[in-house]
């Protein structure tokens, strides 16, 4: 099995090394950002050149975002040797609920799926110090299942693993996870103001049975969530059919 690994914590991150170890015996390729890129979401670098450095055999660093890394991996490094699966992680912390909108880990896997390769994003929902081995082994086992039973269209599975041994898992829906909506103002030594967003990192997880948040944080099970690449809000789409925009014709004839 040929595997492309990436992440958003950087090419030298311990979680990435653990993931590579979990695929021992497979043909493993790594293309990852050359530095920390957490919360970079699906940003892609279109207005500057990128550099690609081979730091070890089959192990590459890109001076860009997680999306850049997977794009380069699939369209350059492995252009003539398509991988069977893209796996992103192991992230240093959870990617639950609303986190997936900001996560570079999830975005790297999403880019793989958008480019036609089944993908898995895996995160360890535990504070440091991190032991990534169990999460990496679970992700590898799941990735092998994805390859063995390929879906009709490329799939993205978002995985969150609690600390310690994985005693079980659940296929879970996204929950709702929000942070303190604060902007912290400070002053630099030259008297100029600067800001941190997000406050002190206070997190609220809504209690939603069957959600990834409940599965991981309350029940201590691994959560596997299939993420849909079509962001259309279908209920609102139907509602909009009854709307009109004054002064404009709806669906005019060509």
UniProtKB/Swiss-Prot annotation:
Q: Which Pfam families match?
A: SurE
Identify the EC number(s).
3.1.3.5
Q: Where in the cell is it found?
A: Cytoplasm
Q: How is the cofactor bound here?
A: Binds 1 divalent metal cation per subunit.
Reaction catalysis annotation? a ribonucleoside 5'-phosphate + H2O = a ribonucleoside + phosphate
Entry keyword set: Cytoplasm, Hydrolase, Metal-binding, Nucleotide-binding
Enzyme class, broadest EC rank: hydrolase
- Entry-linked InterPro entries: SurE (IPR030048), SurE-like_Pase/nucleotidase (IPR002828), SurE-like_sf (IPR036523)
Cofactors named for this entry: a divalent metal cation
Highest taxon of source: Bacteria
State if rRNA-binding is listed as a keyword.
no
MF-aspect GO terms: 3'-nucleotidase activity; 5'-nucleotidase activity; exopolyphosphatase activity; metal ion binding; nucleotide binding
One GO cellular component term, please give it.
cytoplasm
What this protein is reported to do is described as:
Nucleotidase that shows phosphatase activity on nucleoside 5'-monophosphates.
Family the entry assigns = Belongs to the SurE nucleotidase family.
UniProt protein name:
5'-nucleotidase SurE
Which organism is the protein's source?
Anaeromyxobacter sp. (strain K)
- Lineage from the top down? Bacteria, Pseudomonadati, Myxococcota, Myxococcia, Myxococcales
